[in-house]
């Protein structure tokens, strides 16, 4: 844990987990709270599933060609923008579908560049363990996104604070990836 780039990846993937679980867990109630028809929830989740395929494949392809840390920064910052547009726009079925498509494209698009960075920086010998640690952070973020989304809704009758935190976390994750050093760490030679 003495490698700052590794810590940045862990922190960034926490944000990914927060977003995924907040949306997957709470979008049905959020859509209902906004007065939209129930079919919007199904459509959003379906669009997320469908466009996730394209987003993840695109991200993986781009991660072979360009800076993985910059790809991650763009993904997280774009997530924040998409969330902001969605929550600050008047409720409409168009915006719900737009959100499902755009967030679907971004959904798990963080995985290829994150795993690619872990493998590139640290090598593949311990990639299972190292990526497992990064993924643990994702799952902790998932817990907090799902749990605190419900807490905020119960306390305040809306998801506003959960969404505001999501936007702030997007900015944080977008920035925290920038100082990652995309070069292999030196290995100690054993004799």
Q: What is the role of each PLM region?
A:
Residues 38-39, 124-134:
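Loop-to-transmembrane helix entry/capping segments in MFS-fold secondary transporters
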Residues 2-61, 145:
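Extracytoplasmic gate region of multi-pass secondary transporters
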């Amino acid at each position: 844990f003495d490698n700052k780039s590794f810590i940045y990846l862990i922190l960034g993937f926490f944000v990914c987990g927060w977003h995924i679980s907040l949306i997957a867990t709470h979008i049905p109630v959020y859509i209902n709270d906004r007065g939209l028809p129930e079919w919007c929830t199904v459509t959003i989740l379906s669009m997320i599933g469908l466009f996730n395929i394209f987003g993840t494949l695109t991200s993986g392809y781009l991660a072979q060609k360009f800076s993985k840390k910059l790809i991650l920064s763009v993904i997280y910052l774009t997530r924040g923008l998409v969330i902001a547009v969605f929550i600050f726009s008047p409720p409409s079925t168009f915006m719900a579908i737009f959100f499902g498509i755009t967030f679907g494209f971004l959904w798990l698009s963080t995985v290829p560049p994150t795993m690619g960075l872990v493998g590139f920086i640290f090598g593949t010998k311990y990639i299972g363990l190292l990526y497992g640690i990064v993924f643990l952070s994702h799952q902790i973020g998932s817990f907090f996104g799902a749990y605190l989304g419900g807490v905020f809704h119960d306390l305040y009758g809306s998801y506003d604070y959960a969404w505001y935190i999501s936007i702030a976390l997007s900015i944080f994750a977008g920035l925290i990836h920038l100082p990652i050093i995309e070069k292999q760490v030196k290995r100690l030679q054993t004799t």
